[in-house]
Structures are given as C-alpha cells and as structure tokens.
C-alpha cells in the first residue's frame, strides 16, 4: 500500500505527538490485543500476561520502537523492517492475522489518548501505515 504525501505527513505528525508515550501506548495496545483476541496469547507462553505486566509493557515498547523506526523511514519500509520481517516469518512464525489485530488495537489506543487529533484523515492515514507495516512484516512468509 502506497502512502500519499498527506498520509506521510499525518503519520509523522501523529508520531511526533506521541513522542515519549509510544512505549506506554504500545504496551496498552498489546494488552488490548490479548484481551480482545485471546488466541494471540499463544505466542507468549513464557510471559506474565496479567494487566500491567512488566513483560507486556516491555514488549509493547519493542513494538512501539519498531513503529517509530518505520515512521522515520516511510519511503523505505522494507529496508527499515527487513530484520524484523525475517524474525517474524522464519523464527517466530506469527500468524499474519495477528498484525491486523494489533493494528486495530493500536488505532483504538491512539484514539482514546488523542481524540481531538484523531480526525478521520489521521485515522485513515494511520490505518494505511499499519497496513503497510503489516504487509512488510508478512512479505517474507512466502
């Protein structure tokens, strides 16, 4: 999926506003994913998955850091996320549908924390961004 110049601007502006809260929001989105889509828990048998878990927060920060990297490389997502794509496809073997689940929970989390800034245009741009990231992460599954 190609991000338009307006999409790129919306993604960058949103990520700038998120700033230091990215890790917190990543953890919250991951908690939402586990609560809303319990099958996603199967990839984390070694984690304490209770609400507020330090392990979930730490992994949520990793997710947020990867998205921050992606937001900084919107013109080369495959290059920026190549190692992460290899990891998810070849080692972790995460079912691609889980990226859609997490993307949805990220949108909900961001909208709940920034309702005024979460306009329909921003929502659409972030949805396209998360979809593009998901496409890159699943590109090496073939």
Curated annotation (Swiss-Prot):
Protein keywords: Acetylation, Heme, Iron, Metal-binding, Oxygen transport, Phosphoprotein, Transport
Encoding gene, per UniProt annotation: HBA
Positions of modified residues (Phosphoserine): 4, 36, 50, 103, 125, 139
GO molecular function: haptoglobin binding; heme binding; iron ion binding; organic acid binding; oxygen binding; oxygen carrier activity; peroxidase activity
Tissue distribution: Red blood cells.
Organism: Ursus maritimus
Organism placement in taxonomy: Eukaryota, Metazoa, Chordata, Craniata, Vertebrata
Modified residues (N6-succinyllysine): 8, 12, 17, 41
Family per similarity comment: Belongs to the globin family.
Positions of modified residues (N6-acetyllysine): 17
Residues binding heme b: 88
Cellular component terms per the entry's GO annotation: blood microparticle; haptoglobin-hemoglobin complex; hemoglobin complex
Job description of the protein: Involved in oxygen transport from the lung to the various peripheral tissues.
Keyword Transport: yes
Subunit structure: Heterotetramer of two alpha chains and two beta chains.
Name used for this protein in its record: Hemoglobin subunit alpha
Gene3D superfamilies: Globins (1.10.490.10)
Domain spans labelled Globin: 2-142
Signal peptide positions on this chain: none
PTM sites of type Phosphotyrosine: 25
GO biological process: hydrogen peroxide catabolic process
């Amino acid at each position: 999926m190609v991000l338009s110049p307006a999409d790129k601007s919306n993604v960058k502006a949103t990520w700038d506003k998120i700033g230091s809260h990215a890790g917190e929001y990543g953890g919250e989105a991951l908690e939402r994913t586990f609560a809303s889509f319990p099958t996603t828990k199967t990839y984390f048998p070694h984690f304490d998955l209770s609400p507020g878990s330090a392990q979930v927060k730490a992994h949520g920060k990793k997710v947020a850091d990867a998205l921050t990297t992606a937001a900084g490389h919107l013109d080369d997502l495959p290059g920026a996320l190549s190692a992460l794509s290899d990891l998810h496809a070849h080692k972790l073997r995460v079912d691609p549908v889980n990226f859609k689940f997490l993307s949805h929970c990220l949108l909900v989390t961001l909208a709940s924390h920034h309702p005024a800034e979460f306009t329909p245009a921003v929502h659409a741009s972030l949805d396209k961004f998360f979809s593009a990231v998901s496409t890159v992460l699943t590109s090496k599954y073939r």
